[in-house]
UniProtKB/Swiss-Prot annotation:
CDD domains: Jacalin
Stated name of the protein: Jacalin-related lectin 34
Subunit structure: Component of the PYK10 complex, at least composed of PYK10/BGLU23, BGLU21, BGLU22, JAL22, JAL23, PBP1/JAL30, PBP2/JAL31, JAL32, JAL33, JAL34, JAL35, GLL22 and GLL23.
Gene Ontology CC: cytosol; nucleus; plasmodesma
Protein family per UniProt: Belongs to the jacalin lectin family.
PROSITE patterns on file: JACALIN_LECTIN
Species name: Arabidopsis thaliana
Region of interest (Disordered), ranges: 128-271
Pfam families attached to this UniProt entry: Jacalin
Gly residues composition-biased segments: 131-250
Protein origin, superkingdom: Eukaryota
Gene Ontology MF: a single term: copper ion binding
Keyword Repeat: yes
């Protein structure tokens, strides 16, 4: 059932019931009297409510929704105000929809559809109330003189020079009903000499006599093409002056907007940039709903303005352009009354957003491109959709820059799920892939920055099948990732398969079922250094960061050395990496040997807690804590042995520091080993483990004062 609360003075209170989806919403509004809407939906198992302060307004709404077999449902809601945010309520799954913040606007009402649950939701915007305003009085005065009149509030006017005639609108405080102002009037417009940019028509402000402010004086020259100092004179009535200037232009070539330029409002981002760094776009409804661009100037990122309209049902896309190594060379698109599809082409990639493929019989196609030039800015027309688009071009650099920043490759797969981004690191250390019934359910990655290990978050929702995993050696890196994605019945588009290839000609995978559309992330001479994508109940899309395989680490590593471990090859490989030092050792014993170990390290004065390796038993852990930083481990000795014909396990460990020796953890039996190197201290550990500790090794680094 459709419903519409209408628009009100402001939202006062919001009440929700929910579980994994939103069951109902009920809103109380402020007005002449408080008005409570009907319950939209039905009562769910969980409830929440919040009340806004008198000077607090809802400025944005973020929602998630999904399509079930019989209906669409809202799964999560987050409300943002001018002071804080409330939520999320429900579970973030499915596609994201939003009512974004609009300058000077508040969300003053809601509308949507509901039955037993909340199916859809949209909003009404209205201006945020301000203090009393009005038009200042019209005064009689000279130039910047004062005027008296009757008006409400505060008026603003500017004027320069003197003249006799009708004064400008005043700014200030005066007498009169509602606040008649005395202040600065709008001065005359006259004929004068001005400084301008390029060649154009200028407005002169000066001294004059007459009604409407015509006079003679000094004015500002016109704005034209190029930058320079313009000198000229002009005579104008009602604000028109003519100026002539000379100067050197910026060199940007403006190609006219292509599309339907009769609809929407003109917009122009200008051309005072070095390049484009990010593209935002969305499709839905009749075509491309909006575009937005981020630019860079002198190394500083400048965020552009959204052109078009964000709507409740949208399919947002974001494309990162890795300036200065990557730059836009052309734009292709097709349209009817509004833009239906746009392709942004760089020297490295093609990024596309479209609602329909190009249809020659009905659509008009265009290309914006200039030989040996790149795009540094955009302009066009837009209303509820993007009507047309044009571009500014400048010559490409005569030299090709050496890649200095990682390349971010666009995620492949579906458009639903929440955006996630691990960023770029020195290397990938470990990969976890969890499978589900319809595809890859979850992924998780560990990275290395210098000697520090960075643990990425779990992306997606793991199933009872858990994770499959593989760990790279210290001198090994991922050279390519292959995969497949497809849309299954009743399920959003998901990644179905992942395959990882390394610098040592190893292949991990395929993880999942090979089915659907194939993709690959690979570039000669580059390695994979990070991942990003979209995920909800499944991994909907995945992308990668690439960096030259000889890239200098983001964080210089300690001058450490990895000593080969002692024990067997059973279990799973683990490696904590190298740190500044060890703060605490924890050893858990089992019936037949060492069950598990974990360590606490120090990195630049920060405590770093390592993971447990192995499987703890009911015996728990014994601990050996160091007096860090004055105390450090200089040696580790132990033994390993095969029990009842099984793979050997580590059955004893003992730690020696520059001050003392720990107790032996376990019972020594079998083959003895020791890790020790003159002038070095132990700064990290590695090995192999399953239900027991099968192998143990160390990282060492020079002892420093």
């Amino acid at each position: 059932m459709s419903w519409d609360d209408g628009s009100h003075a402001k939202v006062k209170k919001v009440q929700l019931t929910f579980d994994e989806i939103i069951y109902s919403i009920q809103v109380t509004y402020d007005g002449a009297t408080a008005l409570q809407s009907q319950l939209r939906g039905s009562v769910g198992p969980k409830s929440a409510e919040f009340t806004l302060a008198p000077d607090e307004y809802i400025t944005a709404l973020s929602a998630y929704g999904k399509s079930l077999s019989t209906q669409e449902v809202i799964t999560a809601l987050t409300f943002t105000t001018n002071k804080t945010s409330y939520g999320p309520y429900g579970t973030k799954s499915g596609f994201q929809i939003s009512a974004p913040e609009a300058t000077g606007k508040q969300i003053s009402g809601f509308l949507g559809t509901s039955g037993n649950v909340l199916n859809t939701i949209d909003v009404h915007y209205s201006p945020i109330p301000t203090g009393g305003t009005g038009t200042g009085g019209t005064g009689t005065g000279t130039g910047t003189g004062t005027g008296t009149g009757t008006g409400t509030g505060t008026g603003t006017g500017t004027g320069t020079g003197t003249g006799t005639g009708t004064g400008g609108t005043g700014t200030g405080t005066g007498t009169g009903t509602g606040g008649t102002g005395t202040g600065t009037g709008t001065g005359g417009t006259g004929t004068g000499t001005g400084t301008g940019t390029g060649t154009g028509t200028g407005t002169g402000t000066g001294t004059g006599t007459g009604t409407g402010g015509t006079g003679t004086g000094t004015g500002t020259g016109g704005t034209g093409t190029g930058t320079g100092t313009g000198t000229g004179t002009g005579t104008g009535t009602g604000g028109t002056g003519t100026g002539t200037g000379t100067g050197t232009g910026s060199g940007a070539q403006k190609l006219e907007a292509q599309g339907n330029s009769t609809g929407g409002t003109s917009w122009d981002d200008g051309s005072d940039y070095d390049g484009v760094t990010k593209i935002y776009a969305s499709y839905g409804g009749e075509g491309i709903q909006y575009v937005k661009f981020d630019y860079v100037k002198g190394g500083v990122t400048k965020q552009g303005v959204l052109h078009g309209k964000q709507q409740s049902r949208q399919n947002p896309r974001e494309f990162v352009i890795n300036h200065p190594d990557e730059y836009l060379v052309s734009v292709e698109g097709w349209y009817e009354t509004v833009m239906l599809g746009i392709q942004f082409k760089t020297n490295l990639n093609t990024y596309e957003v479209s609602i329909y493929p190009f249809e020659p019989s009905t659509d008009t196609k265009f290309t914006l491109q200039v030989q040996d030039k790149k795009i540094i800015g955009f302009h066009g027309f837009a209303g509820n959709h993007v009507n047309s688009i044009g571009a500014y071009f400048v010559p490409k650099s005569s030299t090709t820059p050496v890649p200095s920043t990682p390349l971010k490759l666009t995620a492949e797969g579906g458009e639903t799920g929440a955006v996630w981004d691990d960023g770029s690191h020195d290397d990938v250390k470990k990969v976890y892939v969890g499978q589900g019934q319809d595809g890859v359910a979850a992924v998780k990655f560990e990275y290395k920055n210098g000697s520090q290990v960075v643990f990425g978050d779990e992306r997606g929702t793991r199933t009872l099948l858990g994770f499959e995993e593989f760990e790279l050696e210290s001198d090994e890196y991922i050279t390519s990732v292959e995969g497949y994605y497809e849309k299954n019945f009743g399920v959003d588009t998901v990644v179905t398969t992942l395959i990882f290839k390394t610098s040592k000609n190893k292949t991990a995978g395929p993880f999942g079922i090979v089915s659907g559309t194939k993709f690959e992330f690979k570039k000669e001479g580059y390695k994979i250094t990070g991942f990003h994508g979209r995920a909800g109940e499944y991994v909907n899309a995945i992308g990668a960061y690439l960096a030259p395989s000889g890239t200098t680490p983001l964080t210089p590593a300690t001058q450490s050395q990895k000593l080969e471990g002692a024990g067997s090859e059973a279990g799973t490989l683990w490696d904590d990496g190298a740190f500044d030092g060890v703060r605490k050792v924890s050893v858990g014993q089992a019936q037949d040997g060492i069950g598990a170990v974990s360590f606490v390290y120090d990195k630049a004065g920060q405590v770093v807690e390592g993971k447990e390796h192995g499987k703890p038993t009911l015996l728990g852990f014994e601990e050996f804590e160091l007096d860090y930083p004055s105390e450090y481990i200089t040696a580790v000795d132990g033994t390993y042995d095969a029990i009842f014909g099984n793979e050997p396990i580590v059955n004893m460990l003992r730690f020696t520091t520059n001050k003392r020796v720990s107790i032996p953890f376990g019972i020594g039996a079998g083959t003895a080993f020791e890790f020790k190197k003159d002038g070095q201290k132990i700064v990290g550990f590695h090995g192999r483990a399953g239900d027991l500790l099968h192998k143990f090794g160390v990282h060492v680094a020079p002892i420093t004062k």
